[in-house]
């Protein structure tokens, strides 16, 4: 799937041309300093703790776990290894997330070890010689796992007149922001040095450790009666006490398999434009319309009259804009569909997304701590990501990368969530990361085809068509949905679930 100049795919589908590999890893002295680093009082962020627990739980079952964010960019010329060594070390010392590693003492006790002096981090280049595409991929995904300090590595693949720069970083220390801000940081520092200029002055990097402190201060003040916590509890209780599962079969989770990514074009440029016009006419944005299409598609595949989804949100503050780390929260989305038109469903979906945005600051694991009858998210919970390159901040990133060949890749291991990624540039496409087995592949193929079918119907004018009421809600389930949806609405919004009507839903189109 391509979003403007950025290619998103599985690493097995990445075919870098053969070349001489030079990779950067820590010196023995740096590794020794890291291992000797004292325990810090700062806990991991909630999303870091989830990653460490899920990695360890999957490993205990003999299963592999997706963990790496891999990004690459093509560069003309020969790499200046001395300059690149400076840039890599400057990056690692600039961002304090790289000074930490984590020790899992038990499921509920994860401790952070912190390197006190950034100068103790030193990466040096190693030349490996000519490698094939397959050998290159194997080397890159062999970056140490989440329980090692050095769970990040960098490298270049040198060819006759160009090279590929790559970063392979455990998600503990990076999110999708790295593909934009992180790569541009490398590019700007490297360009200045090879042009004979002194190292450039970068804006303040901020501190991911400070974010972890702020997050735990905020969550410690929450109680079971906090409105945000109550909203999460309402959502979870209707989904068996946790995050919603993907509604189609995914095969036997106890059988070891890799992960794969399946992509499908949903709409061409003209259809995408018509679809967005339909969303605007429904008083929704593109994301609300896509959530509506996913909800309708799931209804057509399973008969489910209400869609429950989770979508991630970057929770950086303006001060965190340049900060390297994992700043992802989740928004719960509830979208009833039975008996409604697309216009009504899209408005409800948009309202659910907008009013739930503040819940992204409340990690679900904290909600479980406050309400122990709930359960932490299980493997392969359903997650939907949206990447809209027509609006900020992604639109600015795509302009910066014009003319460059940039890629980001899944590492070929099984993801913890089953992740659907919808990307729009001129066209609209979707990709799904899933367990690589025949049952899951069949389900994901049917799922993508159903979403495409719904999107095309809407783009071709089918907004007034009402969704058939395939499955009736039980009275108790209906009351839970009504209670949860009312709780999530802003003042001035009105969703009459009993009569399945929508009125007075205002949308900020610039949000």
From Swiss-Prot:
InterPro entries: CAT-like_dom_sf, Condensatn
Role, per record: Required for the biosynthesis of sulfolipid-1 (SL-1), a major mycobacterial cell wall lipid. Catalyzes the acylation of trehalose-2-sulfate-2'-palmitate (SL659) by adding the (hydroxy)phthioceranoyl group at the 3'-position to yield the diacylated intermediate 2-palmitoyl-3-(C43)-phthioceranyl-alpha, alpha'-D-trehalose-2'-sulfate (SL1278).
UniProt GO molecular function: acyltransferase activity, transferring groups other than amino-acyl groups
Gene symbol of the encoding locus: papA1
Reaction catalysis annotation: a (hydroxy)phthioceranyl-[(hydroxy)phthioceranic acid synthase] + 2'-palmitoyl/stearoyl-2-O-sulfo-alpha,alpha-trehalose = a 3'-(hydroxy)phthioceranyl-2'-palmitoyl/stearoyl-2-O-sulfo-alpha,alpha-trehalose + holo-[(hydroxy)phthioceranic acid synthase]
EC number of the protein: 2.3.1.283
The protein's name in its UniProt record: 2'-acyl-2-O-sulfo-trehalose (hydroxy)phthioceranyltransferase PapA1
Organism for this UniProt entry: Mycobacterium tuberculosis (strain ATCC 25618 / H37Rv)
The entry's keywords: Acyltransferase, Cell wall biogenesis/degradation, Lipid biosynthesis, Lipid metabolism, Transferase
One matching Pfam family: Condensation
Effects seen without this gene: Null mutant does not produce SL-1. Disruption of the gene does not alter the virulence of M.tuberculosis in mice.
Induction notes from the record: Up-regulated by the PhoP/PhoR two-component system.
Top-level taxon: Bacteria
């Amino acid at each position: 799937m391509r979003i403007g100049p950025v290619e998103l795919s599985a690493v097995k589908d990445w075919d870098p041309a053969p070349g001489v590999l030079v990779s950067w890893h820590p010196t023995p002295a740096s590794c020794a300093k890291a291992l000797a680093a004292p325990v810090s009082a700062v806990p991991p962020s909630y999303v870091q703790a989830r990653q460490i627990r899920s990695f360890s739980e999957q490993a205990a079952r003999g299963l592999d776990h997706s963990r790496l964010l891999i990004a690459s960019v093509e560069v003309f010329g020969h790499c200046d290894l001395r300059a690149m060594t400076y840039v890599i070390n400057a990056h690692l010392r600039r961002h304090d997330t790289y000074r930490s590693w984590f020790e899992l003492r038990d499921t509920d006790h994860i401790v952070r070890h912190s390197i006190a002096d950034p100068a103790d981090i030193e990466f040096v280049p190693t030349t490996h010689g000519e490698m094939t595409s397959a050998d290159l991929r194997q080397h890159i995904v062999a970056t140490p796992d989440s329980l090692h300090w050095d769970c990040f590595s960098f490298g270049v693949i040198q060819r006759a007149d160009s090279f590929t720069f790559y970063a392979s970083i455990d998600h503990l220390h990076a999110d999708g922001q790295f593909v934009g801000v992180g790569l541009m940081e490398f590019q700007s520092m490297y360009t200045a040095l090879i042009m004979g200029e002194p190292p450039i002055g970068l804006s303040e990097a901020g501190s991911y450790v400070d974010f972890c402190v702020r997050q735990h201060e905020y969550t410690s003040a929450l109680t079971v009666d906090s409105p945000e916590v109550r909203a999460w509890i309402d959502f979870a209780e209707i989904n068996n006490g946790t995050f919603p599962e993907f509604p189609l079969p995914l095969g036997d989770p106890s059988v070891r398999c890799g992960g794969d990514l399946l992509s499908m074009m949903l709409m061409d440029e003209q259809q995408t434009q018509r679809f967005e016009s339909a969303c605007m006419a429904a008083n929704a944005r593109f994301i609300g319309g896509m959530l509506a299409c996913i909800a309708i598609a799931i209804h057509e595949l399973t008969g489910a009259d209400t869609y429950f989804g989770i979508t991630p949100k970057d929770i950086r503050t303006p001060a965190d804009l340049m900060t390297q780390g994992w700043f992802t929260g989740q928004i719960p989305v509830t979208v009833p569909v039975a008996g409604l038109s697309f216009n009504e469903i899209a408005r409800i979906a948009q309202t659910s997304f907008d009013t739930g945005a503040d819940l992204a600051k409340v990690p679900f694991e904290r909600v479980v701590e406050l309400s122990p009858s709930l359960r932490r998210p299980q493997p392969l919970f359903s997650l939907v990501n949206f990447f809209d390159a027509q609006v900020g901040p992604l639109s600015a990133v795509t302009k910066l990368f014009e003319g460059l060949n940039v890629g980001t890749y899944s590492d070929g291991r099984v993801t913890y969530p089953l992740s659907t990624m919808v990307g729009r540039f001129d066209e609209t496409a979707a990709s799904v990361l899933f367990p690589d087995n025949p049952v899951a592949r069949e389900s994901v193929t049917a799922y993508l085809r159903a979403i495409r079918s719904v999107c095309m119907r809407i783009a071709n004018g089918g907004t007034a068509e009402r969704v058939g009421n395939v499955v009736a809600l039980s009275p108790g389930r209906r009351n839970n949905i009504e209670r949860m949806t009312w709780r999530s609405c802003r003042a001035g919004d009105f969703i009459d679930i009993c009569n399945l009507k929508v009125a007075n839903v205002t949308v900020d189109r610039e949000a």
